[in-house]
Amino acid sequence: MTAALEPIILEAARSYRLPVALIHALIKAESNFVPWAVSPKGAMGLMQLMPGTATFLGVTDPFCPRQNILAGCRYFRLLLDFFCDSIPLALAAYNAGYQRVIDAGHRIPPIKETQEFVTQVLERFYASIKRGRRQISL
């Protein structure tokens, strides 16, 4: 992670009431902090926004770290609100799509990639909490 991203992450954490450590863990899992990352499925930028999601969120440049992080965190907050502040379900929805979580009965869908993603992000998030990284509570 570069220090240049930290003010953006702090802004997003405050704006969307997200723990800083969770944003770090999410970006690490999605793009390994590479702003120009593009997935085989077409997800773009630090928080790997799909084109339709980026458009919905008003992103004009998905490779702009500020736009990408703020939009990704806004979307994650929407998912958290929808799934009653369940971080695991919001992570699953972020990865697989919210409809798949609904179709799975409001559980993590039986998709290996999604299950591994949720586990990876949560492990990083909880490890960071154990290390005492600064938090902004939900």
Feature-to-residue mapping (PLM):
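Catalytic glycan-binding domains that act on GlcNAc-containing polysaccharides
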Residues: M1-L138
